[in-house]
Amino acid sequence: MIIYWDIETYSQVSLKERGAHVYASDPTTGIHFFCWAIDDDEVQTWRPGDPVPASFADPTRYIFVSDNWEFERAIHAQILVKRYGFPPIPIENQDCAQRRALAHAFPAEVGLRCESLGLPYRKDPEARRAMLRLSRPQTAKKRKKPEDPAVRERDLALLHKRCLSDVAATRASYNSPRLQPLIPEERAQLLLDAEINGRGIRANIPFLEAMRTLAVKERNAVNARLNELSVGVITSVDQVTRIKDAVNARGHAMTSLNKRSVAATLAHDPDEVVRELLTLRQRGAYASVRMAKRLLAFADPNDSRIRGWGRIYGAGPGRWSSPGPQLHNLKRNDAEYPASLVDALIAGNYAELARWGNPLAVAAELSRAALCAKPGHILICVDLGAIESRIPAWLSSEQWKVDAFREYDRTGDERLHPYRQTAAHMLQKDVLAIAKPERQLGKAAELSAGFGGSVGAWRRIAHDEDVRSDAEVLAFIKQWRDAHPAIRAFWRELAQAARVAIRTGRPILVAAGPRPPIVIAFDGYALTITLPSGRAITYPGARLSPNTKFEDGDPDIEFFDNARGQWKPARAWFGTLTENVVQGCARDLLAAALLRFEAHGLPVVFHCHDEVVIEVPEGSITTMEVLAILLEPPAWAMNLPLGGKVHSGRLYLEAPATGEPPPIDPAEIDLDRAVDTFVAGAEPLPATKEIERGAEEDFLASLGTNIAPLTDFVSLPMSSDGKVSCPFHDDPNPSCKIYADHWRCFGCGEHGDRMDWLTRVEGMTKVEAIAALQDWSGSVTIEQDVTS
């Protein structure tokens, strides 16, 4: 039997900013009520003071299904069990409707999910506003006037109606024929994912607090210098339009301030004002440092562990995402800064950081030091090497490349590195004659051309300083393709099999043995690609449509995509299918490794892309033993050559113990002196003084369209054209347009500015809305290692 349930709560803590685990354990968090239904029975309600329902008194008789089980599990464990005497529910007796939907590539949000499944459940906008008012009750100190009991009773009635509807919607979506139960291997992964998220990983609180302090000082100093340099026109590093206008007024034509555009402009020897403006922008815009505040908020006050950091199936195809603390965005230490700089940052020794370059840039490179082991333990981090290059060669039987990986793994000889082997095949040279720049050529070609990409993919992968013409890049792409005939054929086989499956409705075996089996099938609605592991990737609403690029080309495959919380048509070509299959296989290798580590009694506390992190007592196991467990191939991948690397220590950060700082650009030294004037405590200019909390009118008047845009605060699912379903009237189609500084519904006519939305829709008080806008840290492109 199955129990479907939904809990409605209240707290002074923000669920979005602190996460379910911190939220549930906070003493101000409580329960209004919860609703539940057994199988197809009528929905019932429990309120504080009621006895424990009989069905909850013996939970092992049921499977408990909630929409987002992380929340219900946390509230049940921290509040229902501890305060109201409910017995614990074993994890084996729980399931998640949202995770099942994500596993089949349907939306996470229950309202949009029901719409995509054709179910007649819609969110009541008035009930949502009631929920927001009741979920963050004002304290007596903050309340400006007495609470109206009649309004509260009306809101509770609306919230109860919403809760009843949510239980019905969860039940209907969970049992939709389009959302089949997970296969046993994936059910095991789901349960392990819950255990790993509940275990969490320890946050390095002193390091995070030091990062936050540095960020505030540096950004305030940079903003002060910008203000002085622009004579008060630019007051913040986040004022992108003003910075571009100032640069373009001096003879340039910048359309963006991304890394590539800034580097290109600086390379053309601009005047000193432009150079300093852009250097200041670079200096202050480091997203990794801005994560310090977020990670501190998600860390448990009792043991400093960050729980609930990952969501299985949160990224395609079936991979994990980190939607709350965003731990997957912590940068690698590519600059190889020494570990001693972590201690320097914690000690506030900014002079030592400055010896190595821009302090914010240095701190960003060290950001993986934000995660650490608990006392007496170490973190052992193992990483599958070049896995997205190995898998295509294995799937397609590109034998020379499979052999190259095996030889490299056997010898460890860097001269035989597969990127060098690729360059040798491209350039038709002996591998021992490949120089370092040519090795980089092989790497760039591998990462850009491996999934059928061309010039555009090369530009995204290659370094900013790459100045090759499109013709040169095309020549390199052709050389890569000529060197990989089997992989090239595999692209076409995948796409052709998908088209045949859609046309005929018959399952198609992409390749016969000894190649790994891949089966593509179409059930009249969804296209599925079953990987060698037995797990399927789903493309809902698949159909063939005319080729949009070549009139005489093969038809495109159109499907519905749930990326970024939306549900909109997307197109797939052979590159898309190949990338999904390769990343899906890589995901399944990682998933199998997680189960092996747990079976060996080695607790996984974090994993990211192709990397696994375990936390063990010091001296309990060697790093090579851990690496050997990672490299054990599952039964379905016995012929896949696997290699990897390992490092260990108290910190997640991989860094040499010591090192010598690089030479500093004289211009950077001059800039340091200018900024240090302000860091040392020089009186800031009046226009740069931080606006005090509560000075609402002055603050709001200072906001431009590029500062704290409303789109960054909207929690409702947004369409590709910036619209959401209006929260003020019942309309299944998105009709409310979100702009940078205001919003307007073209259905009912409701409209307003940022503050209106935050207070009327997001449920914030005026003070909370002002604080959220002031705390906004800017939309900066998050830089990730391209091999990830």
Show which residues each predicted segment covers.
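Short beta-strand-to-loop capping motifs
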Residues: 614-618
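Active-site-proximal helix-loop-helix substrate-binding element of RNase H-like nuclease domains
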Residues: 26-36, 40-49, 56-57, 61-179, ...
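N-terminal structured subdomain of primase-like DNA metabolism proteins
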Residues: 676-788
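A common structural junction motif
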Residues: 466, 629-638
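Short beta-strand
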Residues: 235-237, 603-608, 717-719, 736-737
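Conserved catalytic core of nucleic-acid polymerases
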Residues: 252-255, 315, 421-600, 646-648, ...
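Active-site palm subdomain of RNA-directed nucleic acid polymerases
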Residues: 177-189, 589-612
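Conserved "right-hand" nucleotidyltransferase catalytic core of DNA-directed polymerases
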Residues: 1-15, 26, 116, 130-366, ...
